[in-house]
A protein has these predicted regions:
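Conserved, well-structured ligand/cofactor-binding cores
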Residues: 2-252
Length: 252
């Protein structure tokens, strides 16, 4: 049987599906959300480094959705498949499919296994929505549909940047809250005398409000730094595919 395909077990209970790749075949539970590539990676890279961070998985789903919508808009994906895939991406981005991502964060291939985990799970979730059995890759294929015009080498770095941006926005909100709290104390303590210290020794008089004002300025500078970091992270290589020249991706 050709690589990257699956078939239901002839067993009358239909409790397994058989998936094939260039190495051979594996039996998976019929309702398993991932496929043969993820299962091989799960077995090969059981290194104990902890799971792939959920934030990265959720960010990767957003990248996959963007690619899906772009391919559909350009006519490269059937509309029903694109709609099912986009909805599946939303499920993962919302954190509703965490159990479908079993891989260790320490893995070979610079993210290839994680990319294939996303591709296979998204394909199966889309098949669920289309009323087809999981593993029916002739209907929704992990590579031919989910990973269309993409590579691990452009989607994985993009997902990392999206995850970093989302984390930075959490940090930005925290810095804003901290700055506001310090500024309120600056006003409340404006008339309270204090001693400024240098080298841990009493130095010159100041107010407690001035101390809190200085801390508020430090928080403001850190907030500005998060904004500048996000600006740089917005530049991504999506569309570059495997080596950056966009091979196998249409120019339109």
């Amino acid at each position: 049987m050709p690589a990257g395909v699956s078939s239901l077990s002839p067993d009358s209970t239909m409790c397994e599906r058989i998936e094939h790749d260039l190495i051979g075949e594996l039996a998976l539970p019929a309702d398993c959300p991932w496929g043969i590539h993820t299962e091989r990676a799960r077995r090969n890279f059981a290194l104990g480094g902890g799971p792939v961070p959920e934030r990265l998985i959720r960010a990767y789903a957003l990248v996959k959705k963007a690619c899906c919508l772009a391919n559909a808009e350009l006519g490269h994906l059937p509309q029903d498949v694109a709609a099912a895939l986009a909805a599946a991406c939303d499920d993962i981005a919302a954190g509703r499919q965490a159990e479908a991502f079993p891989l260790d964060a320490l893995q070979g291939g610079a993210g290839t296994s994680t990319n294939m985990n996303l591709n296979e799970v998204l394909a199966n979730l889309a098949l669920d929505r289309l009323g087809r059995p999981r593993g029916a890759w002739q209907v929704v294929h992990p590579l031919d549909h989910v990973n269309l015009h993409q590579s691990t080498n452009d989607t994985y770095p993009t997902a990392l940047k999206v995850a970093a941006i989302l984390a930075l926005r959490d940090a930005s909100a925290a810095f804003q809250a901290l700055q506001g709290a310090l500024q309120r104390r600056e006003q409340a303590f404006a008339a309270i005398a204090a001693i400024g210290r240098t080298e841990g020794m009493p130095a010159v008089p100041m107010t407690l409000g001035q101390m809190f004002g200085a801390w508020a300025e430090a928080a403001a500078r850190d907030l500005w730094r998060t904004f500048k970091c996000e600006e740089r992270l917005r530049v991504v290589n999506l569309g570059g595919t495997a080596v950056g020249n966009g091979l196998a991706a249409p120019r339109d």
